[in-house]
């Protein structure tokens, strides 16, 4: 498994527990890819770049505590991240839902494993839903 870390500037120290847990739970291929962004809203573009331009299996987003972020910015950011999940089938987990790094890593691994299992079961059973 490969993972991308999107980190809001100033929160780089929050990643070590998550990375340690990922390495303990999985066979991480190569290094975890890190991208640091200047603010909360910029995490959306970084996560989209991971989904669109790399081969990572999931993205872990390290955000400041919800109480320290302007509510409109946080809502817009989480909406943007959710859209990436839906558009790209890319598991994205955030420190808003999982403030503990180990929990964050476990959630990412759980979602990747679920996605792999569901994709494997669906192979050969895909229904064409296109309209003529």
Model-identified regions with their sequence ranges:
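Glycine-rich phosphate/diphosphate-binding loop of Rossmann-like nucleotide-binding domains
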Residues: 1-34
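A short helix->loop->beta-strand "cap" motif at the edges of active sites that frequently abuts
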Residues: 87-91
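Proline/glycine-rich low-complexity loops and linkers
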Residues: 92-100
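A charged, well-structured terminal subsegment
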Residues: 102-132
């Amino acid at each position: 498994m490969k993972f991308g870390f999107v980190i809001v500037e100033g929160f780089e120290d929050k990643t070590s527990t998550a990375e340690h847990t990922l390495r303990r739970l999985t066979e991480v291929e190569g290094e975890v890819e890190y991208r640091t962004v200047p603010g909360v809203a910029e995490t959306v573009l970084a996560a989209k770049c991971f989904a669109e331009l790399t081969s990572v299996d999931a993205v872990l987003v390290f955000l400041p505590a919800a109480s320290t972020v302007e509510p409109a910015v946080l809502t817009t950011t989480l909406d943007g991240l959710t859209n990436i999940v839906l558009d790209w089938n890319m598991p994205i987990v955030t420190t808003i839902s999982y403030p503990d790094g180990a929990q964050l890593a476990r959630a990412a691994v759980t979602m990747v494993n679920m996605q792999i299992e569901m994709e494997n079961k669906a192979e050969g059973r895909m229904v064409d839903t296109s309209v003529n």
